[in-house]
């Protein structure tokens, strides 16, 4: 592993030299390419250099202890210092193993999140709205930007479906494990007998797809326009501003009506369409690695029940990793890092196990 790290540091140094080369400075494309690669190696190189510095301090301390035969205070200090440095080296080494794990190429991307009310009628729609609020609050905490792409509200409040975009650094890496069925157990406000109801909502987190990743032939699209509707299906405007796009080869249908302009709705719908088709392609790839996926944190299967939100007990349980927290209120206010970090840590541990690290 240390040989690999040495090679990475060498490449990092090469890139620094290339980026200061006048020929590269005058070529924006090359400069962008090298800068991106340089940035991707920075964290691991800094950690490796920290490891080398600590190792040197450790070896020097050991040498000083061997040579010291006159100063009892120094001897006592070194006997404390050597195990401390050894533990620090091990911690840095373990961090390096995680940094060397294969990266998901989509981790840095923006995401499109789709939340759909499942079983449970009006209560499921209200829960879908709670999840939407939870993710948008989390986006605020992370300084990410959110934008609604399409939404269908219910008469009683809540959403039958809401599709929104989250733009920000590493959005996909933090949110990708949210895909699946979320279940809520609570007493609805309309329930006079105090009986607990169970409802569900399905979440899909799709990485935003670039034009270069997914080429869509416009001849394979059917585009329909219609009047936007509000809760209960009533028309909310008289112009044909809402857009429905059907990708005929895959049967994927996307509609968007949140903007007043047909052009803007079409742009948003195309973003969602591209992400859905890209997601289908990724799912096919994952199915080819089915055996590998069995041991990973959830299969990403949208029908898999991943989490239960139990209101009477103020408890949230993530079923994939048997993780429970009693911070229900805080989680619904967007404080979901505890859940996300637990999922990422489990995934990393499984990857390390597979690699025999």
From Swiss-Prot:
Pfam families: PCRF, RF-1. Methylated by PrmC. Methylation increases the termination efficiency of RF1. InterPro entries: PCRF, Pep_chain_release_fac_I, Pep_chain_release_fac_I_sf, Prokaryotic/Mito_RF, RF-1. Residues 290-307 have a biased composition (Basic and acidic residues). The modification N5-methylglutamine is found at residue 234. GO terms for cellular component: cytoplasm. GO terms for molecular function: translation release factor activity, codon specific. It is found in: Cytoplasm. It comes from the Bacteria. Belongs to the prokaryotic/mitochondrial release factor family. Peptide chain release factor 1 directs the termination of translation in response to the peptide chain termination codons UAG and UAA. This is Peptide chain release factor 1. It comes from Natranaerobius thermophilus (strain ATCC BAA-1301 / DSM 18059 / JW/NM-WN-LF). The gene is prfA.
């Amino acid at each position: 592993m240390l040989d690999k790290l040495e090679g990475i540091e060498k490449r990092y140094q090469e890139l620094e030299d290339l980026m200061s080369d006048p020929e590269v400075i005058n070529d924006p494309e090359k400069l962008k390419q090298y800068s991106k690669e340089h940035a991707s190696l920075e964290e691991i190189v800094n950690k490796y250099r920290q490891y080398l510095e600590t190792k040197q301090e450790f070896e020097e301390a050991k040498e000083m202890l061997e040579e010291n035969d006159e100063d009892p205070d120094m001897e006592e200090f070194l006997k404390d210092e050597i195990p401390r440095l050894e533990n620090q080296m091990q911690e840095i080494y373990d961090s390096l193993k995680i940094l060397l794990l294969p990266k998901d190429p989509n981790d840095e991307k923006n995401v499109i999140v789709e939340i759909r009310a499942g079983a449970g009628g009006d209560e499921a729609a209200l829960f879908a709205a709670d999840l939407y609020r939870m993710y948008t609050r989390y986006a605020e905490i992370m300084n990410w930007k959110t934008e609604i792409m399409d939404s269908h509200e219910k008469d009683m409040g809540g959403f039958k479906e809401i599709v929104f975009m989250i733009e920000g650094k590493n959005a996909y890496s933090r949110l990708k494990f949210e895909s699946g069925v979320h279940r809520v157990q609570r007493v609805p406000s309309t329930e006079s007998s105090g009986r607990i109801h169970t409802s569900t909502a399905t979440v899909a987190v799709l990485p935003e797809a670039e034009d270069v990743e997914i080429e869509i032939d416009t001849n394979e699209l059917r585009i329909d326009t219609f009047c936007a509707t509000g809760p209960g299906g009533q028309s909310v405007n008289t112009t044909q501003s809402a857009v429905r796009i059907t990708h005929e080869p895959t049967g994927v249908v996307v509609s968007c009506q949140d903007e007043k302009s047909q052009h803007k709705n079409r742009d948003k719908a195309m973003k969602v369409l591209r992400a859905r088709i890209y997601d289908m392609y990724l799912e096919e790839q994952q199915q080819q690695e089915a055996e590998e996926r069995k041991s990973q944190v959830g299969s990403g299967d949208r029908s898999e029940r991943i989490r239960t939100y139990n209101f009477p007990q103020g408890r949230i349980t993530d079923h994939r990793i048997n993780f429970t927290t009693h911070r229900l209120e805080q989680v619904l206010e967007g404080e979901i890092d505890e859940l996300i970090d637990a999922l990422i840590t489990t995934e990393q541990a499984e990857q390390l196990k597979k690699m025999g690290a």
